[in-house]
Amino acid sequence: MAGLQGGFTTGACAAAAAKMAAALLCGEAISERISIPLLDGTRESLPLAYAHRLPDGAEAAVYKNAGDDPDVTNGALIIARVVASDKPLEFRAGEGVGIITKPGLALPPGEPAINPGPRLMIESAVREVTDRGLRVTIAIPDGKQLAERTFNPRLGIKGGISVLGTTGRVRPFSLEAVRKTMECSYNVACASGVRHPVLVPGHIGERAAHRHFQVTQEQVVEAGNEWGFMIDLVAQTPPSALLVLGHPGKLAKLPLGHWDTHSSRSASPVPSVRELATRILECPVAESTTVEGVFADLTAEQRQCLGDTLARALQIAVSHRLDHRAPVATALINLAGDMLGSCGDLTPWQ
């Protein structure tokens, strides 16, 4: 988004802190700023929060600055403790950094949630100072609380936040970051043995999935507004069956060809839903500015008819986008989570 200020990832902050700690370990003086190489081939200088020597090593810290991005870790203190090791370079999770417990992520279970990109940045940064064997422990004091506001609990990352970053830079409201999180969720579901996933737009759909069906947390994967991306991702690793569940205010856009359902990038489905309701119900439909309002003015029998018809159109659209690589069922709900209609075989989730 134009005019928004970028920032640095937790991985870049960890690399800067680790470099300063490694420098102290090797007898160098404290610097107010730490210059590090980023994964995009550029360099940046990050301000130091503090640094001091320890009896067996050194510790340094950098405050995370995510710029204008609504990152939950913005302002968090990223701490690196560095001690000598008989291994070339090893990573440990300190306070507030999670441990991976499920397969399907970039690192195996048991490893600290310090992603491959940040590990490369940390290695490049400390190797500018020394070739000695080092143990680098990353800590984020508020990480355990911050992690509750992320996907980490669902991804099986326990005890804290992840140290992330593919380039070292934070791009405000990055679509790439959103999609990466969704991809991780689906990969974890597959690696956990989920064969009947449920795609939902968000929390309303997730709550309804648990209310109406027998599903585990891993089965339910949020697609947000990125339905084209998610269906294409599912097509790469087809499940035994797929359930798409959510509110028709978003999902009725898919049969219209709007696979990015964000309101600023897709047309309102209200006119087409009203036109469909008028045609199949053979009666006037009240004016409304929302799909929820269209359904609210119908009788229970009419709601079921319209809901099932929209669910059928949704099933056809998703099946076509999926290239018919898996059976698709669909279910539509209102904002209260009540069922409006469905299509396809729902027994795998019952």
Swiss-Prot record:
Top-level EC class: transferase
Gene3D superfamilies hit by this protein: CbiD-like
Keywords in alphabetical order: Cobalamin biosynthesis, Methyltransferase, S-adenosyl-L-methionine, Transferase
EC numbers on record: 2.1.1.195
Listed pathway(s): Cofactor biosynthesis; adenosylcobalamin biosynthesis; cob(II)yrinate a,c-diamide from sirohydrochlorin (anaerobic route): step 6/10
Family annotation (Pfam families): CbiD (PF01888)
Gene Ontology process terms (BP): anaerobic cobalamin biosynthetic process; methylation
InterPro entries: CbiD (IPR002748), CbiD_sf (IPR036074)
Catalysed reactions, as listed in the record: Co-precorrin-5B + S-adenosyl-L-methionine = Co-precorrin-6A + S-adenosyl-L-homocysteine
SUPFAM superfamilies attached to this UniProt entry: CbiD-like
GO MF, any single term: cobalt-precorrin-5B C1-methyltransferase activity
HAMAP family per UniProt: CbiD
Protein family: Belongs to the CbiD family.
NCBIfam families the record matches: cbiD
Protein name from the UniProt record: Cobalt-precorrin-5B C(1)-methyltransferase
Origin organism lineage: Bacteria, Pseudomonadati, Thermodesulfobacteriota, Desulfuromonadia, Desulfuromonadales
Encoding gene (name): cbiD
